[in-house]
Amino acid sequence: MSQTLKTAIAVLGIDIGKNSFHVVGLDQRGAIVLRQKLSRGQVEARLANMPPCLIGMEACVGAHHLSPTADQLDLQALHRVRERLVSQRTGIINQIRAFLLERGVAVRQGLRFLRAELPRILATPPDVLSPRMVRVIEGLAGDWRRLDERIEGLSSEIEAVARQDTACERLMSVPGIGPIISSAMVAAIGTGDVFSKGRDFAAWLGLVPKQISTGDRTILGKISKRGNRYLRVLFVQAAWVVLIKPKSWERHGLKPWIEAAKKRLHRNVLAIALANKLARIAWSVLARGRDFEVRKIDEAAAQPA
């Protein structure tokens, strides 16, 4: 069955396989007007020659090249590699701390403190750290340095891309958002038009509470933590950056909102609420194509979302 000039496809469904794709088109009444089997290389050419319609496909690895642009996929690849390297570095640092603590050597929390103290610790007498353990930790420290170099290189490349992208530049006008978050957001959702409002974007990130309904009551629980974990973590980090700089609250128009929220929320809950707010602001900036504009919020209306 194939499409004719008298039939317009309203909805197109694509079943994605490794080498072949099955395409089914429906008209406005739901009747099948197209059914084809295409190779992977034929799909894009076939879609390019069709009138605009609603396209549905399964969410899988094979579908990624059909939706985001090539630039988005490249940027996502940079972020994924960087995320993996950061995770590996964290694992190495935790392992070094664990080995030291097993021998009674405690180091103040924080990456820079361990980096500064490690040479002195490794020079301690053999009764504290055996020569074998010193060699083990020196090897881990070497892995740490190599990961630092790779992470720094990827971060510099991501920042360079963000500085040349108009959408990323706009997003960086939002408090707490820099090149990493802005580029990760653009890579993930493009222009943001896949969401109808900022609340939907925040929900997709998993920054909204779960709702438990019983009878006529609705109970709000912990955040759902669904969706894009990487972006969610970045927005929470952005919220903490804003919270530890109270002098910037007034400049960004967030002071009334934060001060009202502080009175009734634990600081960790406040960080999540602010991350939700920043995500919604960021979506608005991206979707509307305008820089962040400071708008003071009345204390009476400062309800964390």
Question: What are the roles of these predicted feature ranges?
Answer:
Residues 1-305:
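A detector of single, family-specific signature residues
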